[in-house]
Amino acid sequence: MRTGIGIDTHRFADGRPLILGGVEIPGERGLAGHSDADVLTHAIVDALLGAAGLGDIGQHFPDTDEQWRDADSLALLRAVLERVTAEGWAVDHVDATVVLERPKLAPHRNAIRDSLAAALGSVNVKFTTGEKMGFVGREEGAAALAVATLEPIGP
């Protein structure tokens, strides 16, 4: 069994949708990024890559490569799951937290969890605020953290 941790942050940007776990969240602004800026899925991708010993998201999907511009992060997640599986690992569980002042995410919990569970299987998502401290508390951006546990495939 192996465990990996992932973290990601993105600034807010006007004129972009807020995508978390592949779900568009209604609100005034989204997150800036080369891809769809899904901070939650990016943290999960990094946790999976770390657990499998496969580096990090920037090595696999560099923001200097135009092919990843506006990429659907769930597609990146599925690609990483294929690589993890090819290395002989299966997802046991993923636990993730989004840190964001607003909008409030609790009403979207089931949709986000269901979206991620379709790819991952066992997943838990949590939400918290920055308690008005730091870049999250000043509503400059959002952060996400994830822990992934992998188990070997087969005997």
What are these regions (language model features)?
Residues 93-104, 108-138:
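Short, conserved loop-to-beta-strand elements that form functional interface hotspots
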Residues 37-45:
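Short alpha-helix carrying the canonical HExxH Zn2+-binding catalytic motif
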Residues 13, 17-26:
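Polyampholytic, low-complexity intrinsically disordered segments
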Residues 25-35, 63-68, 132-136:
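A short glycine/serine-rich beta->alpha loop
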Residues 47-90, 101:
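Glycine- and Gly-Pro-enriched alpha-helical subdomains that act as flexible
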Residues 136-155:
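C-terminal edge-of-domain segments
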Residues 2-8:
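Short amphipathic
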